[in-house]
Amino acid sequence: MAKHWDHKNTKLSADPKSMTLAKSLISASTGPHGYAVVLGLGDGSLTKALLLQSRYHVIAIDDDAARVRKLRSELQGAGLYGTRCSVLQKSPVDCSLPPYLATLITTETPDRIKGAWKEIAQALRPYGGIAAPGTMAGKPAGFERSVLNGLPLIRRVGALPGSAQYEGNYARCE
């Protein structure tokens, strides 16, 4: 007879301020699914709030081993680590995100990464990917800038430069 592991998941929680911010960011984005990236961890509350209020696959990046270990442990206890969330120990400034990956990019520690937003913004997906950097000087070219609840927000609007409007098979079946 096979024995089954009786594992009870712990309940994940986030502070009210992070829950409110996550809800606002999700509303401002193109939808509650896709990839969200959190660059720089404080207590991990914003990462947890994004997981609780959306269907995002969340990638959290921080260079502090203790913060990474703590958040991984909480997410593993909740049954979310590896299925909906990854926590990477790496510098959030030098993480080299792939282009067009994220629906949403944000941070729990805006002062630690304020100089890198021009490069980080390249990881936003076309047609509405947003970044909430917390603080930002200037505006990366090709992005729309706005304010969300007092925080600067940048959005990649429309198609990528040089891309074509697809008019393939059955696009014009008059």
Regions found by a protein language model. Give the residues of each.
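ADP-ribose/adenylate-binding Rossmann-like module
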Residues: 129-137
